[in-house]
Structures are given as C-alpha cells and as structure tokens.
C-alpha cells in the first residue's frame, strides 16, 4: 500500500523541483535562501526525492499507548481517576507517590493490571512501599515500572541524597526487592533536551549514561531500562532521534549478548520551547 499510494500522480524529477524553486525565488540565491544546516551539522535541502532514500531497516514499536500522570492523595480518589483514564484508552499511567504508606487493594480495586502499565514515581524510595508493590505485582501479574533515574537525578540537581557510593549500594539492594517489576530505571534523556543539547548530544549522552548503568548493575539491567525522551519542534528530526535510540540501544544490548525485541520509550513534549503566557502557542509547538 505504501509503495502504490501515489501511483496516480506523475513523478517529478529533482531537476524540475529545483527549477521551480529558483523561479519562485525570483533571482535570489538557491543555496543561501532555502538550504540550511542544523545544529547537528545535517545539511537540509528544501526537498528530497527517492534518490536520497536509504534502506528501510527501521525498528517499529510493537505497540504504543497514551500516557497520563496522576498524583496519589487518597487511594479511593486515585482509583476513580485510573478507571476514568482507562475508559479514555489511557493505558500508561504514572502515579506520583508522596505518602509513606499506601493501600494497594483500595488503589487498584476492580482494575485489571495485566494490560496497562503503571509507573511509580516515588518522592523517596521507601523500602516498605516498594516491597508491597513487588508482592502485589507478583500476585496480580501487574505491569509495574519504577520511574527512577539515579544518575539523572544527580544530573538535574547537582546533589546526591547522601553520596554516590551509598546511593549505588542502596539501589542495588532495591533491585533485589523489586524483582517482579517490568522495568526499574527510567533514563531521563529529557534532561539533555531541556538543558539545550542538540539531538546528537542527547543520543550520545543518554547511551553513555545507559552503559554506565550496565557497568554499575550488570548487563541484566538492559531489559529493565526505559528511556524518557523529550520531543522538540523539528518533526522529522525528532522521528529520526527516536529511531536512533532504538537502533543504538539494540546494538548495545546485542554487544552484551542480551538481545531485546523492543525498546521501551516514553515520549513527552519538551518544555524548552514553551511559554508561560500563551497556552495555544504551546499546543502548536507540541504538534
């Protein structure tokens, strides 16, 4: 279907496109007016033809879900929020938890957790809560994920809660507790986007950070890493960025002898190009 989509239209040569653009420019220089170079050093033309098409060896995700965040206040209230989101076909839900203890039976009452992903963002990695979540996941075959980025938190704040060595040891112990979680690290590549890194820097820094997690916690962590990516305004470049993440993480995982079928990516709109003054502008910039 893709190859025959435009078969009813006559093909137009690259030469014709260039002639038409030069005519429309009314004497202005073609190269300086419509060609430009991105921050990544990519020379972008005003049009591309099949001549520039590369091999179609893309990694397509198995599926995708709409995501939403909620903040846990009262378990019964949050239960209603989750049920409402599910009716709206939101199947990835991040729950921010600031409490020291939670009643999971009330929070997830009458909710089938086998087909939705629940991400837990804890203010503090409370051992009691994590242990309860792990047992609940084991009992109910839940798709639980830990939204935590040990190195990313340090990157964004500049401080360890205690010190580097103690934080690493503590997280190693936590990994022994949450053995029934589907993922345990949500690497915030978004930190680099929000700090002004270009796409190549975002990808390379994120892969270095992911590899450092492998060095710290062993190669088995590979299948338990998610990537949170902040999406900018350059539509095609952002598509290429996400595709590059998939290719590189699969390449790295293969080099460690742990092949993965799907790279788990959480895509969010970047805050870097947003304004506090105009909601409609922000909506357009995220489209």
Predicted regions and their residues:
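Catalytic alpha/beta active-site cores
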Residues: 1-235, 256, 262-264
């Amino acid at each position: 279907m893709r190859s025959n989509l435009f078969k009813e239209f006559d093909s137009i040569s690259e030469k014709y496109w260039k002639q038409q653009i030069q005519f429309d420019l009314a004497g202005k220089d073609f190269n300086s007016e419509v060609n430009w170079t991105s921050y990544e050093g990519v020379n972008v033309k005003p049009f591309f033809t099949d001549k520039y098409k590369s091999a179609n060896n893309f990694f397509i995700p198995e599926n995708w879900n709409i995501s939403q965040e909620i903040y846990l206040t009262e378990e019964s209230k949050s239960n209603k929020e989750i049920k409402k989101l599910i009716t709206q076909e939101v199947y990835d839900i991040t729950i921010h938890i600031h409490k020291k203890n939670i009643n999971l039976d009330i929070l997830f009452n009458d909710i089938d957790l086998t087909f939705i992903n629940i991400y837990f963002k804890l203010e503090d990695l409370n051992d009691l809560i994590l242990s309860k979540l792990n047992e609940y996941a084991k009992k109910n075959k839940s798709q639980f994920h830990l939204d935590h980025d040990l190195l990313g938190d340090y990157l964004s704040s500049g401080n360890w809660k205690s010190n580097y060595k103690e934080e690493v040891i503590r997280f190693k112990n936590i990994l022994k507790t949450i053995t029934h979680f589907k993922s345990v690290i949500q690497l915030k590549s978004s930190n680099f986007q929000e700090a002004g890194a270009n796409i190549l820097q975002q990808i390379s820094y994120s892969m270095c950070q992911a590899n450092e997690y492998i060095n710290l916690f062993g190669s088995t962590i590979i299948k338990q890493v998610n990537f949170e990516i902040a999406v900018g305004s350059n539509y095609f470049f952002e598509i290429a960025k996400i595709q590059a993440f998939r290719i590189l993480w699969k390449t790295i995982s293969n080099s460690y002898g742990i092949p993965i079928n799907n790279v788990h990516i959480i895509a969010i709109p970047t805050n870097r190009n947003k304004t506090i003054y105009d909601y409609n502008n922000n909506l357009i910039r995220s489209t």
